């Protein structure tokens, strides 16, 4: 006797979505991310300029 083949349910034509639900995470807009990066750059520049005077 031949073995029966088991078939799996279709997965949406090969496309799978892992994050269908909204996750509970911090949401940052692109403008917010840019602002955070610019603040870090400004802090770095200031530390390069006045850091040696403060930290010896």
Swiss-Prot record:
Main location per the UniProt record: membrane
Name the UniProt record assigns to this protein: Preprotein translocase subunit SecG
Tagged with keyword Glycosyltransferase: no
Species for this entry: Pyrococcus furiosus (strain ATCC 43587 / DSM 3638 / JCM 8422 / Vc1)
Subunit-level organization: Component of the protein translocase complex. Heterotrimer consisting of alpha (SecY), beta (SecG) and gamma (SecE) subunits. Can form oligomers of the heterotrimer.
NCBIfam families in alphabetical order: PRK01253.1 (NF002318)
GO biological process: protein transport
Membrane topology: Single-pass membrane protein
Gene Ontology cellular-component annotations: plasma membrane
Compartments (UniProt record): Cell membrane
Family, per entry: Belongs to the SEC61-beta family.
Alphabetical UniProt keywords: Cell membrane, Membrane, Protein transport, Translocation, Transmembrane, Transmembrane helix, Transport
Extracellular side: 50-56
Domain of life: Archaea
Lineage, uppermost ranks: Archaea, Methanobacteriati, Methanobacteriota, Thermococci, Thermococcales
Gene: secG
Transmembrane regions: 30-49
HAMAP family for the chain: SecG
Side of membrane Cytoplasmic, spans: 1-29
Leader sequence residues: none
UniProt-listed Pfam families: Sec61_beta
């Amino acid at each position: 006797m031949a073995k029966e083949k088991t078939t799996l349910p279709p997965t949406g034509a090969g496309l799978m979505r892992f994050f269908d639900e909204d996750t509970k995470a911090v949401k940052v807009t692109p403008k917010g991310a840019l602002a955070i990066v610019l603040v870090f750059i400004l802090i770095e520049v200031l530390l390069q300029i006045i850091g040696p005077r403060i930290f010896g």
